[in-house]
Amino acid sequence: MKAKLLVLFCAFTATDADTICIGYHANNSTDTVDTVLEKNVTVTHSVNLLEDSHNGKLCRLKGIAPLQLGNCSIAGWILGNPECESLFSQKSWSYIAETPNSENGTCYPGYFADYEELREQLSSVSSFERFEIFPKESSWPNHTVTKGVTASCSHKGKSSFYRNLLWLTEKNGLYPNLSKSYVNNKEKEVLVLWGVHHPSNIGDQRAIYRTENAYVSVVSSHYNRRFIPEIAKRPKVRGQEGRINYYWTLLEPRDTIIFEANGNLIAPWYAFALSRGFGSGIITSNASMDECDAKCQTPQGAINSSLPFQNVHPVTIGECPKYVRSTKLRMVTGLRNIPSIQSR
């Protein structure tokens, strides 16, 4: 297909010479753009492509509210820190909002294995079913399930413990070997969490578990680990010289997970059947929740814009303009605003 260029010629009769105007009309535009070769080129017309504003709030996405963790971290929420109990009622969300310096995480000090990977897994979850994987009253008849509390996880001034875990202790002077299994019949991935207690001294080990040589074994089709408690005095954290290390795995549908131990097991109480949703995510933000609805959420605030690009924040959730680092991005819809004049 041949392209044709139409050029307008304006001829004027003059005494000394003829003047011919070639091209287009200049205007009063002050639009400037940067090109590959030049900066601040004035053009006749241009349109803005870059959104640089937000409302500074956390909003619903397409009518669905986020899960706002408040003073709780992802760890505190998923383990069941007693101070995060109010969050358990929310079963679905558009995204998860966590504050940068949340106070309520692992109330009993210790190491949370593969924590960043767990956050990554939860970032794609939009709802879950929280259910008793091992019911408290019937699963552990030979062990005590009520004495495993600690001042470091206190609630309303009383010693307490995580709402999704059970600290099993000796019963009538004995801690029999235990073996407990669960078959995933949920037709969804199930998130299972547990812990291993590492006392600070051998006296505590004997008093709580009635053995000096304890082990914890956890086995499924995709997970196989054996843990040996490390008894050692450590610097006090939240008043504790002992530690609990926290672990998790995803159990596929129809797979089986088996727990065996002769001491030191922090057993699963509740687990989570996960439903993944397109467009979910986790943001870290100090922004407050507001009665607003948006298509795009950033940690700085929500964006409601039809422009194709934004420079508010690289982390986004929802239907968002593409992030660019530019401070100005315009598309030229006219020509250079300098007419060409030729005399003859």
UniProtKB/Swiss-Prot annotation:
Misc: Major glycoprotein, comprises over 80% of the envelope proteins present in virus particle. The extent of infection into host organism is determined by HA. Influenza viruses bud from the apical surface of polarized epithelial cells (e.g. bronchial epithelial cells) into lumen of lungs and are therefore usually pneumotropic. The reason is that HA is cleaved by tryptase clara which is restricted to lungs. However, HAs of H5 and H7 pantropic avian viruses subtypes can be cleaved by furin and subtilisin-type enzymes, allowing the virus to grow in other organs than lungs.
Assembly mode: Homotrimer of disulfide-linked HA1-HA2.
N-terminal signal peptide: 1-17
Post-translational modification: In natural infection, inactive HA is matured into HA1 and HA2 outside the cell by one or more trypsin-like, arginine-specific endoprotease secreted by the bronchial epithelial cells. One identified protease that may be involved in this process is secreted in lungs by club cells.
Originating organism: Influenza A virus (strain A/Xianfeng/3/1989 H1N2)
Disulfide pairings: 59-292, 72-84, 107-153, 296-320
InterPro entries the UniProt entry points to: Capsid_hemagglutn, Hemagglutn_HA1_a/b_dom_sf, Hemagglutn_influenz_A, Hemagglutn_influenz_A/B
Stated name of the protein: Hemagglutinin
Keyword vocabulary terms for this entry: Clathrin- and caveolin-independent endocytosis of virus by host, Clathrin-mediated endocytosis of virus by host, Disulfide bond, Fusion of virus membrane with host endosomal membrane, Fusion of virus membrane with host membrane, Glycoprotein, Hemagglutinin, Host cell membrane, Host membrane, Host-virus interaction, Lipoprotein, Membrane, Palmitate, Signal, Transmembrane, Viral attachment to host cell, Viral envelope protein, Viral penetration into host cytoplasm, Virion, Virus endocytosis by host, Virus entry into host cell
Protein's membrane topology: Single-pass type I membrane protein
GO CC field: host cell plasma membrane; membrane; viral envelope; virion membrane
Its biological purpose: Binds to sialic acid-containing receptors on the cell surface, bringing about the attachment of the virus particle to the cell. This attachment induces virion internalization of about two third of the virus particles through clathrin-dependent endocytosis and about one third through a clathrin- and caveolin-independent pathway. Plays a major role in the determination of host range restriction and virulence. Class I viral fusion protein.
Residues with attached carbohydrate: 27-28, 40, 71, 104, 142, 177, 286, 304
Alphabetized Gene3D superfamilies for the sequence: 3.90.209.20, Hemagglutinin Chain A, Domain 2
SUPFAM superfamilies the record matches: Viral protein domain
GO biological process, one term: virion attachment to host cell
